[in-house]
Amino acid sequence: MNSHVYIIAEAGVNHNGDLDRAKQMIDVAADAGADAIKFQTFRAEYVVSRNAPKAEYQIRTTDRTESQFDMIRKLELTETHHEVLIAHAKMRGITFLSTPFDEHSLHLLTTRFGLQTIKIPSGEITNAPFLLNIARAAQRVILSTGMCTLAEVEAALSVLAFGFTTPTTAIPQREKFEQSFISEAGQRALRDRVTLLHCTTEYPAPFDEVNLRAMDTLAVAFGLPVGYSDHTPGIHISLAAVARGAQVIEKHFTLDNNLPGPDHKASIEPDELRALVRQSREIGQAMGDGIKRPTASEWKNRNIARKSLVAAKIIQAGEIFTQENLICKRPGNGNSPFNYWDLIGESAVIKYESDQLILLEQNKKRTYSNE
């Protein structure tokens, strides 16, 4: 059983459009031991109409008079920025990931820079044309499921299955999506190439709306690897997700919660990121394989902690064993206490001093041994 939890340190737009800050975030994620650093790739003109309203959390954390278009345009990373950041991540030994929000950005990531894994954000899960192009461009997909019903997740997976298993000349149709989803080839492609992330799309996410049990629902419904994209304060909900079996954890982080920008307040700082990685690794190791058996370190303690049958007082050879002259005491390398009732009423074959281990040879049946 693989105990390694894949941790994505989500830089998102917390670089505020500053290349040096973005590079520093890569350093922080690498030093923390995260598996990947993830950014967001977009062109404002392709993503947001100029009259699109801000989300409530964006209004709370940014200039109220500024449009959503103007807000995100300041957070764009250029093609040159991407080139520098990908090289820096490679130098630091951490995987570079990014979420594309438009076709231009998808092409940039997969064709220009050769990214094999694409993260699909919750907001794009009903964007069927985009999903299809992602399936045809990416080797692997991480799909966030915030704001989704189970039916919407299945619909998105159907589009991905179609894209994975048909030639680019195939004409997209809903019926064909569904056929691809239920086909053996489609299911195999989904299992091999897709990871689902449970998510609550609110910043920060209220604890009573997290619903970690939905990870189990996703796993049972679709038979795919499942993880958790965490927008709650702190790291404890991420750790709870790891304990519930999440194979991937995605968590927003920032260099400073007090920086201006839409996501800083809902992000953890570097010390918390380090703690998240360390404790996730420890929990992953602690999960084990589920087989109940003594561990390697426990074997040396068995005889120390367990008990054996011993003489409660001097017992003469030929004397009858009774409840008064038998007792169970440590160490546990002698006659098992499970043989207690078999010995009662039997005669001692030798003389026993007080606290002396009762010989296994006393047992007529010798059914149980402590070894």
Question: PLM features: what roles do these ranges have?
Answer:
Residues 1-371:
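Catalytic cores and adjacent flexible loops of soluble metabolic enzymes
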